[in-house]
């Protein structure tokens, strides 16, 4: 868990904002959402495979767009 020390004369809102930013960088919220419910190993593999296919298709589409002439 990220730790944020409140500086002298620092408003609470600023410290809270720094804490939220450090939590987001550490991936705490995404980890909590991922572990909220048990996911079977087959579902994990299927989800990762689908994400890989989606990334690949996105990359292909970007390359295809680059090769087309804009007229």
From Swiss-Prot:
GO annotation, biological process: translation
Keywords from the UniProt entry: Ribonucleoprotein, Ribosomal protein
Region (Disordered) location: 40-71
Any Gene Ontology CC annotation: ribosome
Keyword presence, Transmembrane: no
Pfam families, alphabetized: Ribosomal_S21
Composition bias type Basic residues, residue spans: 43-59
Presence of the UniProt keyword Ribosomal protein in the record: yes
GO molecular function: structural constituent of ribosome
Top-rank taxon, per record: Bacteria
Basic and acidic residues composition-biased segments: 60-71
Coiled-coil spans in chain: none
Recorded family membership: Belongs to the bacterial ribosomal protein bS21 family.
PANTHER family registered for this protein in UniProt: MITOCHONDRIAL 28S RIBOSOMAL PROTEIN S21, SMALL RIBOSOMAL SUBUNIT PROTEIN BS21
HAMAP family tied to this protein: Ribosomal_bS21 (MF_00358)
The protein, known as: Small ribosomal subunit protein bS21
